[in-house]
Amino acid sequence: MTRDAGDDQTIRVRVLDIHRSVLEDESVLAEDNFYDMGGDSLLSLQVLGRIERELGVKVPPRTFFTAESIADVADLVAAAAENAAGDDAPRPAGDHAGRASMAQEWALLSSLRDPQAPILQFHAVFRVSGPFDTQRLEAALNRVAERHGSLRTSFTAADGVARQAVDPGARADLAVMDYRGVPDAEVDEFLRGFVREPFDRSRAPLWRTLVVRRDEAEALLVFVFDHMIADGWSLDTFVEDLSAAYRGAELPDRAGQSGAYADWAAGQWESWQDGRAEELADYWRSQLSADPAEFALRLPGYRGTEGLSKPASLVWDLDPATARGLRTACQDLRATPYCVSMSVVKALVALATGQGRVTLLTTNANRLDGAYQSTVGWFANGVFPTTDVELSGTFRDLVSAVRASILGATAHGDMPAMFVRRRIWPELPAGFRKDPGVYFMYNDVWGGGLGFGEGVTVSTHHLTEDADSPGLHMWLLREGEGLRLQALHYESEYAPEYVKGFAGCLVKALDLLTGQPDRPMSELLDPAEFAAVRG
């Protein structure tokens, strides 16, 4: 079959339209670079997914990363179009057994060896107001579990190898409790214990649901997941399917996007053994210091510790003007909120420590393969974007540099962080990270799409979190039009007063740097006004 110029031109127009739609910017031109126009790794997945669904063409993600312009992407699509027939056949997510993924194996074996290992669970709590039927909920939960094999998966370990298996008969774990009239503080205290109760990983399901009745018209809905079977991205898929199932609607069409997790895990091991390990090690050696001690970033307020004690948290709802300023700056800088806010953190760390090269810990969604974009499972990996920070330069220039480091980290973030770190530094002990660092992440509150139909309102209910890893961990969370800063730490490492001072300086720096991105950062970040970050 031959193609004519008209076919290729149609593809170019469609590809450009997809980019404009995802970027929400009709001014985008074919010669523009996707990332220069505000694109990021998450938005790139939307582009790739729509190209595959609407044009029937699967573009290799790493090739997409290297395209100089949207026109180059269109050329890739046009070149691949003749071979696209049949590529969108759905991949079954049926019963399977096989070796666990690299992250799953590392986490399971590490937890068996280390009784102090983090629990590795996450949760979502929602306040549901209006008529809410728990029998319909249970039926919907089981319908979703039937669709996603990971929700029926358990694990075993033998001879240093972890294996996963799907139990075809596993049912959703739903409990209903009546806490009407109980004070809110007591309910939250109970829930904080409930969400941290560990799972028996040898028995499915490794997730549970709790409905807490607060009065006749209101309940709290709690989901708890073992990280072994899901990540934050998975939660969005889960609540979208659950919302449809509860309403009795058809579940979203995920053909070609929900391959079996065990297949992905097998492919990951093959890639590691076929040379990807050295590719990643070479890249990260070029980014990180040869001395692993320099990786463990310690802010001036770090106390040093022989052990971790007194987990603590700080939550700060930012002024609406700060949230608006960030959105405006993102449009001006042609960058995402994640990139812009990470740039602010890097500038502040450079000011606090005097370092000219800053490494932060963050998370990569690791969903570059469109065949698994809607698979529930643990895909996310830790990465370490590293950037030269010159405070005499402008914030605009720093954002550009941070964007490049984020893209590099995303393209080289397809294997678990500990595997990569031990490849670079073989002397590191196996198991969970023991050294401190500074972690930062910006994202929407996961699970925001949950809905149960007309007459029922759903809102997020925030529980006080506990730190479970060394270092200072910060999230900037978008919920609607607002922003919430959350910081987790151990008091044995950082005093609450220091963390509060650092957070206040971060908010102040966010306002100053996004408000005047073309002034030298050294003129905006007066050391006297930011003395709190120096301890």
Residue ranges and their predicted role:
Residues 177, 210-263, 495-512:
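Active-site-proximal acidic secondary-structure segment that organizes catalysis
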Residues 1-114, 118, 139, 143, ...:
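Regions immediately C-terminal to embedded phosphopantetheine-bearing carrier domains
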Residues 29, 117-138, 187, 201-223, ...:
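Gly/Ser/Thr-rich phosphate-binding loops and adjoining beta-strand/alpha-helix segments
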Residues 79-115, 138-183, 205, 240, ...:
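Short amphipathic alpha-helices and their capping loops
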Residues 58-62, 148, 152, 239-240, ...:
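Extended, hydrophobic beta-loop-alpha segments that form or line the acyl/peptidyl-thioester binding
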Residues 15, 100-101, 137, 148, ...:
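Low-complexity/IDR signal
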Residues 130-146, 162-203, 281, 321-327, ...:
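A short, small/polar-residue-rich loop/turn motif at beta-strand boundaries
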Residues 115-121, 149-150, 217-218, 271-280, ...:
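His-Asp-centered acyl/peptidyl-transfer active-site segments
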